Amino acid sequence: MDLGVKPATQRLYIGIDPGVTGAVAAIDQKGQVISLQDTPTITVKRGKVLRREYAEPAMAALLEGILQSAGAAYCPCGNPSRHLMQNVLVALENVHSMPKQGVASSFSFGVGFGVWRGIIATLGLPHERVEPGVWKRALKLTANKGTAVAKALRLFPRAELGHAFQGRMIYSDGRAEALLLAYYALQQANSKTPLKSKA
């Protein structure tokens, strides 16, 4: 499985957009993109309808792969697990139902959020659940996802935020928001201000 992971240095900040079209991003303390991957999903037939659902084992493997690669770089003693806890911070977007959002969509989003929380807890990672309005205001974004894509392109011009389709680029707001969540965590760490999260 290609995790798209590059060697990391020192601290690691991970941002997770928990939607089924979301993503996981990891950057180091210099803002270098270490990994940027879509949330692993599978296509399942429910009755006559094909649906995308979360691929939980692959989600866990993705996060573990990022940590293993980063841990090897962090730890010269050969025991990366000893040092991961003090070198990693995960920013998980805290989800809730939104106006005009369908029941099925809200349920799916909540499932993804719960799966990621379980994986993070199992790995014992330091993390914060961050309200969308909090991190977006801090980065001067609006509710329009296009502003997140534009901001991510400015901050991370080399990141793979989209793909070419019929002669034009289609950008992933899930990848953009995951990157910006990681960037928000980095900014808060640099300012020595705890992430503003909901308990």
Model-derived features: where do they sit?
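Phosphate- and other anionic-substrate recognition elements at nucleic-acid/protein interfaces
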Residues: 1-199
